[in-house]
Curated annotation (Swiss-Prot):
Highest taxon of source: Archaea
Natural source organism: Thermoplasma acidophilum (strain ATCC 25905 / DSM 1728 / JCM 9062 / NBRC 15155 / AMRC-C165)
Cross-referenced NCBIfam families: PRK08566.1, RNA_pol_rpoA1
S-S bridge residues: none
Gene: rpo1N
Family statement: Belongs to the RNA polymerase beta' chain family.
Catalytic activity as recorded in UniProt: RNA(n) + a ribonucleoside 5'-triphosphate = RNA(n+1) + diphosphate
UniProt protein name: DNA-directed RNA polymerase subunit Rpo1N
Coiled coil: none
GO biological process, one term: DNA-templated transcription
Residue positions binding Zn(2+) 1: C60, C63, C70, H73
Length: 885
């Protein structure tokens, strides 16, 4: 039979009868031992050769196959006494409740049976909806369970009580119903009555849920391992089966020898415990079976269920070959489409190339190089690791056999060559929460031990460089490589399907640098310009202006060199949002309204609104008008220009950024004192009972709302005072105003005051009895006692302020952790619910049986990445373009 493949037409789930278990079995296991003194499997033991082989050199006694040929075969154990299958306890109770203890019939009258039989016979038990079947059968079972007298034989019935996990008894007695008695009761149920329980008697008789024969899984399901000491260590399942066989033998001997009933019952309970924990070692109500070391055994249910179980861990998702994982590092001079791969990884990862008449000479040259070739300068050169013959045999290439195998290869062979520059690979960072968590990059072989990529690609991956690791997958098929280049390449993912705007763009230093380069259009000498432009292509040169006989270059002209010809765009910069001036193009003293005409920057300041992810107007326009390739080229040039410029110019921030004069500190302290007076007056008014409640609120809520409002006002006002002394010459302010990092609120907390700390939108009120900390009087509801921090980070927080600040900060951490787990679970449920949906050729959304879900994908059939941020058209885009000038 080996080697014969058959197509599976259908799968039917059923219970195994004792006879089927015996027929399926190749050996009756009667001894608990595994190997003899010579290390050879014992006959009729748990490692009997009839159940398969795991040792090289041995052959299976059933099919004659070796280790890699034998699929494994079942054995069986004849149990001394019946035991309840823990997985069917609910069903057993259902049968005991709804059937007569004497005659075994379902406790429905003949009239009810005649009425309900046509209804249940209409149901298709094999292909019907399980929920509909369950609702119908539950109706019959509930009706039958309520009867305390059998309508067929007149026998008085008792209510059945289940003492979990597997003990049954009749109500009012402590005498348990033994598994043997349960089995006898279930055997009396006629086949014709089983339809009312949703059971098919041909595939599932109820007495089969009480075990008399236990199947023993094949050896390759529970292989033993050899430890470093040379001792064998058996699998957890084998340990449990040993316990079951030993207790079953003791129970059989005690029963046959006429031992007292108490001893027999104890051994029977012990056998039930071992069989229960063999199936599920986390059954509530009984202690888990443990290894000698104290570790809980991993039995059948634990191997199947959960994230680490067989289905989710080994079938839905697997570990794969041709992949690599290491720490990531930034490399500002790589293209967004590129990934820097360490030489060590490039030598290990291979791409299969099928030899044909067009590439055979090239492949021979590659093979002749061997495994570790280098050029005359000692740089990496692609080698070959393996060649594969047409019959599937792999030949490892070494420096000794390289020339011989180069001559031997022919058309139809496969050459597994190492990575070379330009190969397309998939790059991924987990958690993979959206499409852009896995994108196609082209390879650049670099020295070092880390993967490197352009910082502009951090946003879609949500990556930073504090120790993050990423995965790289080398594509093995030509069709997949073509797909990756055309669909998955980074430049094709610039626009996010979530909001229809760019998700790849300049971050942090890029934004700061371009802000400094363009704000107020600074002037540079020829030498300075050469330094700034050094990292760009040599043919990109800005337009020079002659002033007093000298060549000068302006920041906007330098930035214009990286813009494509024909680009026309107008927008307000991020600087505008924090400006006190009007941001209109006709009246713009703050230099905040950007205008680009025919690829030349006329006016404005480049900042977050121009080149950053989520808001980059220039990237958005270039992608829509010139395509993905031009957008990627702009981002490459923009990041090189920004890093080159800021490296040359220099940019430093420090604690001195937040120095404000003593007069400003005094003004802030005065503001805080005034606010405290107002809060104290509010509290006095409240205590006198004169505070008027706000509509829909209690007096207490009104007081809290008023105090929070006062605390918010003083923080905002102190922030304004601090900010008025911190202008656009201050590096930290440049970062905040340009959108590179942080906000002016963060800066005001450092230089002004930190302000009111809150938990769940209100002031702090928990802690000790009637006070937040023992440092305050009981009943104190003043500002300081309820989490108002009057210090700034510059001056430093007092111990109580630091404690309150930590409480406020911890809420953010806990909230983040809770939201992460909830959103992760929600996403998993959505994925499972939608996994059978597909978009067909007519853009209709259907499930696997062809049911229509949506007439048009997304109701409108529009790709969000091609929409104008979710709208059909962008009027500004249409109006302000070539026709403008």
């Amino acid at each position: 039979m080996m080697g014969i493949s058959k197509r599976i037409s259908s799968i039917k789930f059923a219970l195994l009868s004792p006879d089927e278990i015996r027929k399926l079995s190749q050996v009756k296991v009667i001894t608990a031992d595994t190997y003899d003194d010579d290390g050879y499997p014992i006959e009729h033991g748990l490692m009997d050769l009839h159940m398969g082989v795991i040792e090289p050199g041995l052959r299976c006694a059933t099919c004659g196959g070796k280790v890699d040929e034998c699929p494994g075969h079942f054995g069986h154990i004849e149990l001394a006494m019946p035991v309840v299958h823990v997985g069917f306890v609910k069903e057993i109770k259902m049968f005991l409740d709804a059937t007569c203890r004497s005659c075994g019939r379902i406790k429905l009258t003949d009239d009810e049976i005649r009425t309900y039989l046509p209804e249940i016979q209409k149901m298709d038990f094999e292909t019907g909806d399980p929920e509909d079947i369950e609702i119908l059968t539950k109706k019959y079972v509930d009706l039958a369970s309520q009867r305390m007298v059998c309508p067929h034989c007149g026998a008085q019935q008792s209510k059945i009580i289940l003492d979990k996990p597997t003990t049954f008894r009749e109500e009012g007695t402590n005498v348990k119903i033994t598994p043997k008695e349960i089995r006898e009761r279930l055997e009396r149920i006629p086949d014709d009555d089983l339809i009312f329980f949703g059971f098919n008697p041909k595939t599932a008789r109820p007495e089969w849920m009480v075990l008399t024969v236990l199947p023993v899984p094949p050896i390759n399901v529970r292989p033993s391992i050899t430890l470093e000491t040379g001792e064998r260590s058996e699998d957890d399942l084998t340990h449990k089966l040993v316990d079951i066989i030993r207790i079953s033998q003791r129970l059989r001997e005690s029963r046959d020898n006429g031992s007292p009933q108490l001893i027999i019952e104890d051994l029977w309970d012990l056998l039930q415990f071992h069989v229960t924990t063999y199936f599920d070692n986390q059954t509530p109500g009984i202690p888990p079976a443990r290894h000698r070391s104290g570790r809980a055994l991993k039995t059948l249910v634990q191997r199947l269920k959960g994230k680490e179980g067989r289905f989710r861990s080994n079938l839905s998702g697997k570990r794969v070959s041709f992949s690599s994982r290491t720490v990531i590092s930034p490399e500002p001079y790589l293209s967004v489409n590129e990934v820097g791969v360490p030489e060590r990884a490039a030598r290990e990862l291979t791409v299969p190339v099928i030899v044909n008449q067009f590439n055979i000479d090239e492949m021979r040259e590659l093979i002749k190089r061997g495994r570790n070739p280098r050029d005359q300068f000692g740089r990496y050169v692609t080698g070959v690791n393996y060649v594969i013959r047409p019959d599937g045999r792999r030949i490892k290439i070494t420096d000794q056999n390289a020339a011989e195998n180069a001559d031997r290869i022919d058309i139809g062979w496969t050459v597994e060559r190492q990575l070379m520059e330009g190969d397309i690979v998939l790059f991924n960072r987990q958690p993979s929460l959206h499409r852009m968590s896995m994108m196609g990059h082209t390879v650049r072989i670099l020295p070092g031990q880390t993967f490197r990529f352009n910082l502009a690609v951090c946003t879609p991956y949500n990556a930073d460089f504090d120790g993050d690791e990423m995965n790289l997958h080398v594509i093995q098929k030509e069709e997949a490589r073509a797909e990756a280049r055309i669909i998955m390449k980074v430049q094709e993912q610039i626009m996010s399907p979530r909001f229809g705007g760019p998700i790849i763009g300049g971050i942090h230093d890029h934004v700061t640098a371009l802000f400094l380069l363009t704000h107020n259009n600074p002037r540079y000498t020829h030498e300075e310009m050469v330094h700034i432009m050094a990292y760009l292509e040599p043919d990109l040169l800005p337009e020079a202006r002659i002033e007093n006989g000298e060549k000068y270059y302006y920041g906007r002209d330098i930035f214009s060199t990286i813009l494509p010809k024909g680009l026309n765009v107008r927008f307000r910069s991020k600087l505008c949002s924090g400006s006190s001036e009007r941001c209109e193009f006709e009246d713009d003293p703050s230099d905040t309204y950007v205008e680009i005409v025919d690829g030349k920057m006329i006016h404005g300041t480049i900042d977050e609104a121009a080149v950053s992810p989520f808001s980059g107007a220039i990237i958005d326009k270039i992608f829509r008008k010139f395509g993905s390739q031009e957008a990627a080229r702009f981002i490459d040039r923009m990041t090189r220009l920004a890093v080159g410029f800021i490296t040359y110019r220099g940019f430093s921030t420090g604690i001195s950024d937040y120095d404000i004069p003593e007069s400003a500190v005094a003004r802030i302290e005065e503001l805080v004192a005034q606010a405290e007076d107002r809060i104290n007056k509010l509290i006095e008014t409240f205590r006198r009972g004169e505070l008027q409640p706000a509509p829909g609120r209690s007096v207490e809520d009104t007081l809290e709302m008023e105090i929070l409002s006062e605390a918010g006002v003083v923080r905002d006002e102190s922030g304004k005072i601090a900010s008025s002394y911190l202008g656009l010459k201050v590096p930290s302010v440049i970062m905040a105003r340009s959108g590179a990092r942080a906000t002016m609120l963060n800066i005001s907390e450092v230089a002004g005051i930190v302000g009111q700390q809150s938990v769940r939108g209100g002031r702090l009120n928990r802690g000790y009895y009637n006070r937040t900390l023992p440092h305050f009087k009981r009943g104190d509801i003043g500002a300081d006692a309820r989490g108002f921090v009057r210090s700034s980070y510059m001056t430093g927080l007092s111990p109580t302020e630091y404690f309150f600040h930590s409480i406020g900060g911890r809420e953010g951490l806990v909230d983040t952790a809770v939201r992460t787990s909830r959103s992760g679970y929600m996403q998993r449920r959505l994925i499972n619910a939608f996994e059978d949906l597909k978009v067909d050729d007519s853009r209709e959304v259907k499930d696997t049986v062809g049911s229509l879900i949506q007439i048009r994908y997304g109701e409108d059939g529009i790709d969000p990445t091609r929409s104008a941020r979710g709208k059909a058209v962008d009027m500004n885009y249409i109006l302000f373009d070539e026709e403008r000038r």
